[in-house]
Amino acid sequence: MAGHTTADYISHHLTFLTTGQGFWNVHLDTLFFSLVSGVLFLFFFYRIASKATSGVPGKFQCLVEMLVEWVDGVVKDNIHGSDVRHQIGSLALTIFCWVFIMNAIDLIPVDFPPQFAELLGIHYLRAVPTADISATLGMSVCVFALIIFYTIKSKGLGGFVKEYTLHPFNHWAFIPVNFLLEAVTLLAKPISLAFRLFGNMYAGELIFVLIAVMYMADNIIPQVLGIPLHLIWAIFHILVITLQAFIFMMLTVVYLSIAYNKSDH
């Protein structure tokens, strides 16, 4: 721990391992745990796929098949074009699993990652990538780029320009107003997507840290109360991390369906 006071403890647990200064500041811990989460997802699915059989499937194969069918159903309900359905389906599955694994890191006791890092001479370490706005905003920017891509793919460059200049008021005189309204709506999608995930995961991480502070109290009462509170919040947080992964995936699919489906607008 970086200090001896409660404020020092909280500050230490909420400080990233960084390199660089200013705009070029990079959160190394966020990058590391994001990559580890992605590798775990790929390794797990590769192992299941390589051992898949046409006979009686194992428990993990059943789990993966159910997950794939569920995500495929979500995509089919939203994407009308079969030519991109598999692409967006693969993206949706990746988003859900990747975000879920990154969220699930929050269930590791808050003192374990920093204390292990201290053994390696690393003074600061935050293990939950989705509690970092730079990570969630980075994913949302990728979704934003895909929204632009699929809008142009579906409607053409001319249709893309018309969509953001002649809607909702179909007259050339309202082009500036239309563009402003549509630009705000378009930019709000990735921003809200990023801050929704970040806000929920940051709050969850902070609550775990505050509960851990109770174990440091001199009085026995908060120390005892910290145990059931920790357990209750951890159980509830399982729902939160799953729900947030689903919401991020679902909104991505919905945004891309609006961008691609010609019937919209």
Curated annotation (Swiss-Prot):
- Regions that span the bilayer: 26-46, 88-108, 132-152, 168-188, 195-217, 231-251
Q: Which UniProt keywords apply?
A: ATP synthesis, Cell inner membrane, Cell membrane, CF(0), Hydrogen ion transport, Ion transport, Membrane, Transmembrane, Transmembrane helix, Transport
- Respond yes or no to whether keyword Acyltransferase is given for this record: no
InterPro entries according to UniProt: ATP_syn_F0_a_bact/chloroplast, ATP_synth_F0_asu, ATP_synth_F0_asu_AS, F0_ATP_A_sf
Tell me where in or outside the cell this protein is found.
Answer: Cell inner membrane
Query: Mind telling me which CDD domains this protein's record contains?
Result: ATP-synt_Fo_a_6
Q: Matching SUPFAM superfamilies, A to Z?
A: F1F0 ATP synthase subunit A
The yes or no answer to whether the keyword Methyltransferase is present is no
PROSITE patterns in the record? ATPASE_A (PS00449)
Q: What processes does the entry annotate via GO biological process terms?
A: proton motive force-driven plasma membrane ATP synthesis
Q: What is its main location?
A: membrane
One GO CC term, this protein: plasma membrane
For membrane topology, the record states:
Multi-pass membrane protein
Outline what the protein does: Key component of the proton channel; it plays a direct role in the translocation of protons across the membrane.
Q: Which NCBIfam families match?
A: ATP_synt_6_or_A (TIGR01131), PRK05815.1-1 (NF004477)
Protein name as catalogued: ATP synthase subunit a
